[in-house]
Amino acid sequence: MATIFSRIVAGEIPCYKVAEDDKFFAFLDINPMVKGHTLVIPKQEVDYIFDLSDNDLAAMQVFAKKVALAIGKAFPCKKVGQAVLGLEVPHAHIHLIPMQSEADMLFSNPKLKLSPDEFTEIASKISAAM
Ligand code: 5GP
């Protein structure tokens, strides 16, 4: 059965898309730690990120870099942090999180509740910065 993230890529489940190329897809995390929290995934369905081939892992990181630079332009911050957990969704993903402090990377923090309009605005600001 397809993962929830493959269903998002296929358009079967809605998302707030940030960017896409032939191999990778970026969209807003639905339970963001901060505004601009974005997920980057390979379209290839792989659970563990370190099971990707060397070439695909490198290409995913280059794609994530473009998205991260755009997040930093759209949401001024000290740096955009990157994290890989993958304990909840069995489809490899990189979290990109604009940080004002180390505390912004604590996954145990309460998540933001944003309206659809806010999500739409955030996604378009990042897309426009790409
Ligand atoms: P992890 O697997 O890295 O522990 O966490 C998975 C992340 O995916 C979480 O931050 C969660 O909010 C996000 N997530 C889970 N399901 C969905 C979904 O259906 N749509 C979006 N946009 N994000 C999701």
Predicted segments, located by residue:
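HIT superfamily nucleotide-processing domains
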Residues: M1-M130
